[in-house]
Regions:
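Surface-exposed, charge/polar-rich loops and edge strands
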Residues: 1-415
């Protein structure tokens, strides 16, 4: 059963939240962060992308960069740009994208739940990325950014959230970079806090939607602090890390598409012939064509869109991995025909997240940068949960969640 707790959030005053809040650290590079921060000294990028305070080209892994993050976090608090709440609260966070709003509960998730598998993952993590995030957590003694969880739909929590959503939020703004709405409510009522804690305690599992490296880093630092504390009792703040938990049915998973630089020595016709072994191939013409259902793919090649429908027998409906379109495309197109065996390291392939649309696939091929593009039907939350429950791991680059969590609305200190 899942254990969560309220915590004393560190957060901006109402009048500063729009200046401080930012996109997450991993959706933009250092130079993009430098441009977005501009001359805004209050931008959270000075804490989560502190290399922007050094000469361009400074490595984000430079020891001075981590130290700068800690110095800036301290300075933000000293200047009153970030203040810690007096009491332990939960928080309700709403995101609005294209007229649709989803509501998450900001909680302290239990480190032991991650270590024992109650918090379920569906992606492999890389040790170098874990270590980077661990250094950031250690030096700040805080989870500056939350991780993104899904939980099974719950009518009690849904009713509680709706009650708060009908009241005036603590924060309410539209982010200038993406046009998405962000709102936050503080749950300080003791009875409501008890309800949230007890409802989570009934849940057999929580699911990481996005933020596998942040989750691993937070849990590993928590375990490290417990091991190094001779007076460890188990109720210390480092036993918890900050997560925003959304009902699974509210979440939108977008398509995560592929662009490839060459056809592995094949002509276009040879490539299409090779695909016909496992797919029904239909030329859809020059107008952009989006996959309409599971096991249908859209190929963009030589100015034309093709529908590729996987033939019966090319996938196993009873295998939670083998039935995924990301697996089918990796096995039968990228590996078998194009010779791309490692999606993480092969320089011939790149990935385009769903919000950028199929127009971006067309642009990258038409420009000559890429030879072909492949659009996939989005993975469903049910598929993600089935895989996590089975203890298996999704293929790389399978899920793209939008909207991304806004960073800087709430921060969790570990002591």
């Amino acid at each position: 059963m899942a254990t969560v707790k309220p915590f004393r959030g560190v957060r901006p005053p109402q009048d500063l939240v729009e200046e401080i809040a930012s996109r997450p650290y991993d959706v933009l590079d250092s130079e993009e962060a430098r441009v977005e921060a501009g001359d805004n000294e209050k931008s959270l990028y000075h804490i989560i992308k502190p290399e922007i305070d050094f000469e361009p080209g400074t490595s984000e892994y430079d020891p001075r960069v981590y130290e700068k993050a800690a110095a800036n976090f301290k300075m933000f608090q000293e200047k009153g740009w970030l203040r810690q709440d007096a009491d332990e609260n939960y928080y309700i966070y709403a995101q609005t994208m294209n007229g649709k709003t989803q509501y998450g509960l900001v909680v302290g998730a239990f480190v032991n739940d991650y270590l024992d598998g109650t918090i379920k993952k569906h992606e492999l993590t890389r040790r170098d990325k874990e270590e980077d995030r661990m250094k950031h957590v250690r030096v700040n003694d805080a989870n500056i950014e939350p991780v993104f969880f899904a939980y099974p739909d719950n009518e009690v929590l849904d009713a509680l959230i709706k009650r708060y959503a009908a009241t005036k939020p603590e924060y309410d703004f539209v982010a200038p970079d993406d046009g998405f709405g962000h709102q936050l409510w503080v749950v300080s009522d003791k009875a409501d806090i008890d309800v949230i804690t007890k409802e989570f305690a009934k849940m057999p599992a929580l699911y990481i939607a996005d933020g596998h490296h942040r989750s691993a880093a937070a849990a590993l630092v928590g375990a490290e602090k417990a091991k190094n504390n001779p007076n460890h009792k188990g109720d210390e703040e480092y036993n918890y890390f900050m997560a925003v938990c959304f009902q699974a049915s509210q979440l939108t998973v977008l398509d995560y598409n592929r662009v490839v630089k060459d056809l592995n020595g094949l002509t276009s016709e040879q490539f299409l012939d090779a695909l016909r072994e496992n797919f029904e191939v239909e030329d859809k013409g020059e107008a952009i064509y989006k996959p309409q259902h599971l096991h249908e793919f859209s190929l963009y090649l030589d100015g034309h869109w093709f529908a590729l429908n996987a033939k019966q027998g090319t996938y196993d409906d009873y295998d939670p991995i083998g039935v995924l379109d990301v697996d089918i495309s990796s096995r039968l197109i990228l590996d078998k025909v194009l010779g791309i065996t490692d999606l993480r390291s092969d320089k011939r392939i790149d990935f385009v997240g769903g919000l950028r649309g199929l127009e971006e696939l067309k642009r990258r091929v038409d420009s000559g940068e890429m030879r072909m593009a492949l659009a996939l039907y989005p993975v469903s939350m049910k598929q993600i949960i089935d895989i996590a429950d089975s203890g298996k791991i999704m293929p790389p680059k399978a899920t793209w969640f939008e909207p991304k969590l806004r960073s800087g609305l709430v921060i969790h200190k570990l002591s």
